[in-house]
């Protein structure tokens, strides 16, 4: 039996076949990106390329859907691809185990994506990816911060300018820096509510945000749904 049978009942068989042939790039497969990938795979998307340079860490277990104890230390791209294939063995999923930055953004274009999901944390890399996609006319949606939240209500998808006053540090920086680069109206997922706690110094001395399983997974599924809806 076709595992997508019930999905087709929602969107219709012809639109389903059309949209699932599209190519999606997911940049970062951690909390938000991993959940977005999960949604795309379970929906039935057939062609996905995932980018990440990191390995699964024990601290990922509280929120990242791809992480389990038996894959700690393994490349996230490998883990995510294996999970995708366990859901749909016929999926065409490519893995690129790199940190996306200005010098290798051509890798994105080479995939000829119909949509890019930006789920990376590095501000500079995020800015460069967004600028590149806007310049190359590649549709892209970016996730802003999902840390320091227990309550996962308040997530919306709108222009990045609408993040003003939401208390998210990443949103503020992205809003300011994108404006400097002449980019307006960038589609972003963000929360309209302020974070419930502040970043604290972790054991390694970094200013790290707290996290719970709810917000990043809700955010990732919202991003996946938005992309599918835009392509239908």
Question: Model-found features: residue ranges?
Answer:
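Conserved S-adenosyl-L-methionine
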Residues: 42-47
